[in-house]
UniProtKB/Swiss-Prot annotation:
It comes from Vibrio parahaemolyticus serotype O3:K6 (strain RIMD 2210633). Keywords: Cytoplasm, Hydrolase, Nuclease, Ribosome biogenesis. This is Putative pre-16S rRNA nuclease. It comes from the Bacteria. One of its GO terms (molecular function) is nuclease activity. One of its GO terms (biological process) is rRNA 5'-end processing.
Amino acid sequence: MSRTIMAFDFGTKSIGSAIGQEITGTASPLKAFKANDGIPNWDDIEKQIKEWQPDLLVVGLPTDLHGKDLETITPRAKKFAKRLQGRYGLPVELHDERLSTSEARAELFSMGGYKALSKGNIDCQSAVVILESWFEALWGE
């Protein structure tokens, strides 16, 4: 059975999202949700979850380059993951998101130049990078 996985790139002003299929190991950007100090409009997230019906949620875990928690943002991303699990009853996994934004910027720039580098596009592409990295870790690549 192939699972549908939804990923989130947590931020205090914007939360990017992506969807992917475990069988293909690929992901596509969905929507960037505006956040107020890290708190999204939960109704918008619920609509997306109902539409796509994922089996699992993956939240990017922000750390420094050595894999250590960042003082302010890491605990907030963990709290966001716990809220997702509590609200929607879906399993949630945290996944290392180191350098995902840099990779997302590079991919977007190669596809559309500076015009493609909007905040929402970057956040959603970061969620794609996080999810595809999660797939690679799942398969041991």
